[in-house]
Amino acid sequence: MSMESATHAVRARLLDFTGLGYRVAFEIGDEGSITIDASGTTPEIVEDAGGDEDADCVIKLSMENFEKLIAGTLNPTLAYTLGKLKIEGSTGVALKLAAMLDD
């Protein structure tokens, strides 16, 4: 999956992040990053924001695991436990995001 495809996949699920109330960055291997800014009323995407220092939570994972996460075939909690993704910043925000991805 390319970064363009990854961004499209997130954009397709963007409304799922309404009410998150935070800014979350996905650092996807060496490919780049996608930031979801859901701190306002309407979630927005920023592609390749350089890891986004303003993010409340940064989730680091491979493109393969990102694709599975967005598709709903990778359990975020299990992926964290197994080391398939790493969290920097607020774990609480990551848990809230995980619940939104499971819906």
Give the residues covered by each predicted segment.
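Feature captures hydrophobic
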Residues: 1-103
